[in-house]
């Protein structure tokens, strides 16, 4: 029997859920939990407004069709499935695409300053993988505007009292309590394996504490820093995902890592130049003569090779990111036709991204944010000179495996406790940390959408799970939480004190640099099994060397050195999942490309990679498993739900190839035509 009192436990404590992560996925999960009258503890490693979502530039997709091009959620679904090379389950994609217009209108009502047309309508730009203007945007700082808008809604709930079962406010209890500068260490698992709380560390005073929760959502972003230099923030280590993976959570499609085609090369950090630059008319080119010494503006059209337009005339500069990155990589690495550097007399790994043919006032209105970044860090005026760019690790399509429940028509059963649930009962995932929506390649501007939609789905699912609980986590014995807290405190003390007498200790930052260089060089755009064996051997070497790390900073406050050692141990765990998954998948699909296996192999590999932790140094890959959700046993296999869009070969040379509807052909979907919104999913 489910617990009757959903506000207080039998001991009188307020029954809270926990959300870990203050980005778009986490904030939307908090909002939907509060709307379901579930009090929340929100944990964030950094101040919420510094979450990595703030870095997103280009926009958010929604098939509103204000330009009368014939776009629709059905086309959006087809192009997302096609762009992901049919590695994503299609019902969650359908739910996301159906809900997208309502999400954008909701954000508009929240005050997001979207760009508008002269008529006052929301403006939309084109992004990669589509021929439609589908991407709503707020200049070139869309992520920041969305993050601030959702945080304002969460702050509103920080002032709302928790009411008891009689509608009386409980003194000192608010619907949301925000704990910033806390680092997630692990989940607290009950005797039955269910998640009943977390252990976290206060980075201000380094105290370790266990927190109870009826249900927990991890919304902690991607693992980009595993690759060293990337477009990701330094906080994107994947440490929370690795921690719960270590505890038994299954990791899905870890090998699917997106490399963005246009970033500013740098020795320390690769700074993103958004796809919106190409969406607003930017063109990628190199000189036809590999030894051309002229300045780019002195090179006439006839002497330029517009690489993407030549190779993919159907979509041109707006082919999906995996295809654009491989084309640029081929041009620079295999053909040695990158921009010629007269000082070094060699061709650099750079191509031109040119916006100089566009009106400056137009560019300042649409792209000022990213062009200011280029001017600041490259020292060149992008309004008058083409930008020099090269691909960079950007996003993880893989992540924590999470479930969904579909109905007979292919839509999600909204409110099902299975939606966004990991295989650990009570533990949910939302945002880049989950694997759910993008398959083997993410379309540009689907990331902000998937983060928000995942939160909208996770919140009601967590509320349903909580309602079905036979007993609250707040009624479990204190010894369970004390044991988990002691385990993590001992682990931290181990890091502080280890190798204190070692004569030649290792440096965690040097080890991370070696890991990043190895992963970036050998596990990104092109992959080779023999080289991946060397990557795995290197990870094994680093697993041994990390045990000899000595922390030089033993401060009792803000000890980032000790924290980084813990994060490095977790990064090594996920690095192995990524590299081993890449070695196992002997085909080319989306962002995963092996020249030795250049074709997609649906017969053997149209399935989810399911990785389960065994011990340090090994990964177990499984084809099926069972887990318990809200008292019901669920059987899961690695098969992909392709019931809505029939798989076919990707051919971006042909305009409109991504969508049967866009070509005017009969859709292969067995489901009825999609509407402009998901009637079951309440969007406020």
What do the PLM-derived regions correspond to, one by one?
Residues 243, 249-381, 385-388, 461-467, ...:
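An anion/pyrophosphate-binding glycine-rich loop and adjacent beta-alpha core
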Residues 109-207, 212, 219, 263-274:
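Conserved redox-cofactor binding core of oxidoreductases
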Residues 6-7, 13-15, 32, 36-38, ...:
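Glycine- and aromatic-enriched mobile tails/lids
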Residues 16-42:
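N-terminal Rossmann-like FAD-binding beta1-loop-alpha1 element of flavoenzymes
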Residues 23-24, 47, 141, 223-224:
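Residue-level detector of alpha-helix initiation sites
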Residues 215-271, 438-461:
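Glycine-rich loop(s) and the adjacent beta-strand/alpha-helix scaffold that form part
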Residues 13-15, 206-215, 423:
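Core beta-strand elements of the Rossmann-like FAD/NAD(P) dinucleotide-binding domain
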Residues 46-79, 258, 269-272:
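Conserved N-terminal glycine-rich FAD pyrophosphate-binding loop of Rossmann-like flavoproteins
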């Amino acid at each position: 029997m489910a617990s009757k009192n959903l506000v207080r436990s039998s001991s009188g404590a307020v029954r809270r859920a926990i959300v870990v992560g203050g980005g778009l996925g986490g904030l939307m999960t908090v909002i939907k939990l509060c709307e379901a009258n579930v009090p929340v503890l929100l944990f964030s490693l950094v101040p919420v407004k510094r979450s990595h979502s703030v870095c997103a530039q280009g926009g958010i997709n929604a098939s509103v069709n204000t330009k009368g091009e014939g776009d629709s959620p059905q086309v959006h679904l087809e192009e997302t499935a096609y762009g992901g090379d049919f590695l994503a389950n299609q019902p969650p994609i359908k739910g996301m695409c159906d809900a997208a217009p309502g999400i954008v209108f909701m954000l508009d009502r929240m005050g997001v300053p979207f760009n508008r047309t002269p008529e006052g309508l929301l403006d939309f730009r084109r992004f990669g993988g589509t021929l439609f203007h589908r991407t709503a945007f707020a200049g070139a700082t869309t992520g920041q505007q969305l993050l601030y808008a959702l945080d304002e809604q969460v702050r509103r709930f920080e002032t709302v009292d928790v009411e008891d079962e009689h509608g009386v406010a409980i003194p000192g209890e608010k619907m949301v309590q925000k704990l910033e500068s806390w680092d997630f260490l692990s989940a607290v698992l009950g005797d039955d394996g269910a998640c009943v709380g977390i252990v976290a560390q206060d980075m201000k005073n380094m105290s370790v504490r266990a927190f109870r929760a009826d249900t927990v959502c991890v919304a902690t972003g991607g693992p980009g820093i595993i690759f060293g230099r990337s477009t990701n923030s330094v906080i994107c280590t994947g440490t929370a995902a690795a921690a719960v993976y270590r505890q038994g959570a299954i990791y899905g499609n870890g090998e699917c890592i997106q490399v963005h085609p246009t970033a500013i090369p740098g020795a320390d950090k690769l700074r993103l130049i958004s796809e919106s630059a190409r969406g607003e008319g930017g063109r990628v080119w190199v000189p036809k003569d590999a030894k051309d010494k002229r300045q780019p503006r002195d090179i006439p059209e006839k002497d330029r090779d517009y690489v993407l337009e030549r190779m993919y005339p159907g979509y041109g500069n707006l082919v999906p990111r995996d295809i654009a990155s491989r084309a640029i990589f081929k041009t620079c690495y295999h053909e040695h036709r990158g921009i010629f550097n007269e000082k070094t007399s060699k061709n650099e790994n750079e191509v031109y991204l040119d916006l100089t043919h566009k009106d400056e006032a137009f560019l300042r209105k649409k792209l000022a944010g990213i062009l200011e970044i280029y001017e600041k860090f490259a020292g060149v005026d992008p309004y008058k000179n083409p930008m020099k760019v090269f691909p960079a690790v950007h996003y993880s399509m893989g992540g924590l495996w999470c479930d969904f429940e579909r109905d007979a028509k292919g839509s999600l059963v909204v409110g099902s406790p299975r939606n966004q649930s990991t295989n650990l009962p009570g533990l949910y995932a939302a945002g880049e940390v989950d694997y759910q929506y993008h398959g083997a390649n993410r379309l540009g501007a689907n990331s902000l959408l998937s983060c928000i939609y995942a939160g909208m789905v996770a919140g009601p699912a967590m509320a349903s799970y909580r309602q079905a609980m036979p007993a609250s986590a707040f009624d479990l014995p204190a010894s369970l939480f004390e044991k988990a807290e002691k385990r993590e405190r001992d682990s931290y003390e181990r890091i502080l004190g280890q190798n204190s007498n070692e004569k030649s200790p290792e440096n965690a930052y040097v080890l991370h640099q070696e890991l990043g260089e190895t992963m970036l060089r050998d596990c990104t755009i092109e992959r080779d099994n023999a080289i991946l064996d060397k990557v795995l051997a290197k990870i094994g070497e680093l697993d041994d060397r990390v045990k000899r790390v000595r922390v030089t900073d033993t401060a009792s406050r803000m000890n980032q050195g000790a924290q980084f050692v813990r994060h490095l141990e977790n990064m090594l765990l996920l690095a192995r999942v990524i590299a081993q998954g890449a070695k196992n998948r002997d085909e080319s699909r989306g962002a995963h490309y092996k020249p030795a296996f250049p074709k997609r192999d649906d017969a053997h590999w149209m399935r989810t990679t399911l990785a389960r932790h065994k011990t340090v140094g090994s990964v177990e890959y499984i084809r099926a498993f069972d887990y318990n959700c809200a008292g019901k046993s669920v059987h899961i296999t690695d098969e992909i739900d392709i019931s809505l869009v029939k798989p076919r070969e990707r051919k971006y040379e042909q305009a409109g190839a991504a969508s049967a509807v866009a070509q005017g052909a009969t859709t292969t979907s067995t489901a009825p035509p999609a509407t402009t919104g998901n009637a079951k999913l309440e969007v406020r």
